């Protein structure tokens, strides 16, 4: 697929959170529309600068292949990191002290021993939760409503300029009211989308810490896992969402 927000997250922060090595990402982007004279697939930035020739740039539209990026990142990990370097990179990626300090208040009252932390915060360090339609079953929400919640939330969060706990609460609470749903029911699919489970630390705090790139990507992934949206549905839902947004503008609280 082409590199688009609909199918591939375009923010570099997403790929950092997913655990890609910066060297591998630069390597992969360098290969999009250009190749080394010897056709080697793995190369560093300095190698690329030394060998770059504008005449060798391909005119066709580049295709972003995440499986290829995974393969290339794996090569960088295996071929360029010894055990100590590997440990250092993992620690740098996973144990961000600032983020850890923000997470502690969310789980401290629920922890009786340190080994309890992993199940509570595992979703903060993982990629896309592996979900299917069964994860979104809810006694008060049918599948279409679940998918509308995810799609409308995706649209609303795409337009959110200031990413904060209070801002997220305000926007999603207003959206729940516009859809005439209780906030608890409305948030259920979002818990699953963001954390992979309906049992997780406070959602808005977790979303604020995860950041916009990862949260938006997980919601889009969850929408596909819950059944996706047809073109006909998307057109109808877009019209309904615009009406909800217009009503909010006309009658702000």
Cite the ranges covered by each PLM segment.
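Amphipathic alpha-helical interaction elements
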Residues: 17, 74-78, 95, 112, ...
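Short alpha-helical scaffolding segments that buttress acidic/His motifs in well-ordered protein cores
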Residues: 29, 73, 104-111, 124, ...
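Intrinsically disordered or highly flexible coil/loop and linker segments, enriched in small
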Residues: 34-38, 57-58, 78-82, 99, ...
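Charged substrate- and nucleic-acid-binding regions of tRNA-handling and nucleotidyl-transfer enzymes
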Residues: 166-236
């Amino acid at each position: 697929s082409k590199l688009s927000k609909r199918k591939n997250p375009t923010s570099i922060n997403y790929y950092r959170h997913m655990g890609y090595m910066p060297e591998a990402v630069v390597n992969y982007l360098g290969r999009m529309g250009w190749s080394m004279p010897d056709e080697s697939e793995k190369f560093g930035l300095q190698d690329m600068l030394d060998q770059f020739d504008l005449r060798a740039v391909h005119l066709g539209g580049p295709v972003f292949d995440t499986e290829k990026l995974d393969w290339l990142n794996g090569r960088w990990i295996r071929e360029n990191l010894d055990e100590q370097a590997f440990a250092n990179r993992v620690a740098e990626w996973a144990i961000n002290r600032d983020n850890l300090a923000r997470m502690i208040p969310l789980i401290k009252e629920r922890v009786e021993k340190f080994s309890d932390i992993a199940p509570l915060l595992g979703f903060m360090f993982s990629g896309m939760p592996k979900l299917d339609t069964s994860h979104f079953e809810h006694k008060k929400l049918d599948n279409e409503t679940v998918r509308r919640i995810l799609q409308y939330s995706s649209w609303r969060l795409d337009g959110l300029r200031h990413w904060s706990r209070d801002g997220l609460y305000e926007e999603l609470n207003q959206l729940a009211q516009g859809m005439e749903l209780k906030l608890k029911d409305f948030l259920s699919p979002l818990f699953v989308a963001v954390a992979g489970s309906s049992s997780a630390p406070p959602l808005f705090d977790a979303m604020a810490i995860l950041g916009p790139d990862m949260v938006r990507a997980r919601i889009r992934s969850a929408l596909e896992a819950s059944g996706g949206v047809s073109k006909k549905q998307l057109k109808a839902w877009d019209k309904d969402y615009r009406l909800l947004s217009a009503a909010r503008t006309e009658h702000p609280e």
